[in-house]
Amino acid sequence: MVQPGQHRATARVLLHNPQGEVFMLLTHFDPEVGLPPRWLTPGGGVDEGESVRDAAVRELREETGIVLNPDQLGEPVFHAIGRWDWTDGNHHTYEDTIFQLQVEGFEIDTSGWTADEHRDVVRYRWWNPTELLESGEAVAPHGLAEFLVRHLA
């Protein structure tokens, strides 16, 4: 769980299929701090002493069941630094690094999910980037939805 004032580095993987659709997870994140539900790519926090690339591979395995070697990921395609303001007046900052991986499709395996993920992930689906942008749904990090339209359209 993110603490008030904490800086959180995350590693994520932009999974897309040959049709250009993106696999996203809808999460409540942490209802206790009042952040709205939003769509995210698979990923999560970088552990102390862990590289961003290794964290992306670990998180992808935990959240989807996809097993990769770290060198199967190319260079990061999106990087965002920002701040989430909480409804109670607190906030936390973040730095997201997103890698890209094309997949033909897969059956998600949630057996690696933490208790928080089972509580917080509402659903998951493939999105057409333009439909995601035009849906009005919240997408994190800031600017990702616009990037997806430019990058995958």
PLM regions: where:
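The catalytic Nudix box helix
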Residues: 41-76
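Nudix hydrolase/Nudix homology domain
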Residues: 32, 37, 105-153
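A structural microfeature
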Residues: 24, 75-78
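Active-site-adjacent beta-strand/loop module that shapes the phosphate/pyrophosphate-binding cleft
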Residues: 19, 78-112
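Conserved hydrophobic/aromatic beta-strand scaffold that supports enzyme active sites
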Residues: 24, 98-100, 124-126
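Residues that scaffold the ATP/ADP-binding catalytic core of kinase and kinase-like folds
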Residues: 25, 49, 132-135
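A generic structural micro-feature
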Residues: 3-7, 35-38, 89-95, 116-121
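N-terminal strand-loop-strand
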Residues: 1-40, 53
